[in-house]
Amino acid sequence: TFIFLLSTSNFLKSRYGSQFFKPIISVFQTKNELNKEYVFKNNVYIRLYQSGFEVFKKYPVFGVGNKNYRIETCSGEINSKYFCSTHPHQIFFEFLAEHGLAGSMILFFILFNLIFSKIKTILNSNNYLQLGCLIFLVTSFIPFLPSGAFFADYNLTIFWINLSIMYSVGKKTNVYTSN
């Protein structure tokens, strides 16, 4: 669905194609090391991802804490490896930087278990509302796709609303009516 929308929508083409995919593809197509370095230094998303990874390397086990990424990257002693922002704009780097390996493994286990434990039931139910919620939840975790801060009020609210609707509208997935 996303690939279809990306290929038909001019807005999505310019948003994701020119800002994210095109620079990455150009890195692999060029043999010139200076051009690769230029792309990596001037692409905002790549710099944000690198910054998130650097924060994770500094605090690998427990991370910097929830919503503390900005404090680490925007403090007075700005490290040249960091790109000052509120979050790294990618869910995996955000979880690793803020919660480390321990917290990320726990969060991903819980979230993936909630989302994927009922996937077979949802796909067989022909319930389009459940399927739409499932697609939204799965696309929230597409690797290297820029995203908003997961723990920001808006993003987390939309995520939990979709998860709640996915579970509540089906007879076999509703915890109050399932056997």
Predicted regions, residues:
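Long extracytoplasmic/lumenal interhelical loops at the membrane interface
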Residues: L34-H99
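Short, hydrophobic secondary-structure boundary micro-motifs
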Residues: F62-G65, M105, F151-Y154
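Hydrophobic transmembrane alpha-helices and their immediate junctions
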Residues: E77, E98-F141
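Membrane-interfacial segments
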Residues: Y16, K118-N126, F150, N174
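A membrane-periplasm/extracellular boundary helix in multi-pass inner-membrane enzymes
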Residues: T1-K36, Q50-K58, N66
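Hydrophobic core of alpha-helical transmembrane segments in multi-pass integral membrane proteins
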Residues: T1-S7, F108-L111, I115, L163
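Transmembrane alpha-helices of multi-pass inner-membrane enzymes
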Residues: I110, G132-L145, A149-N179
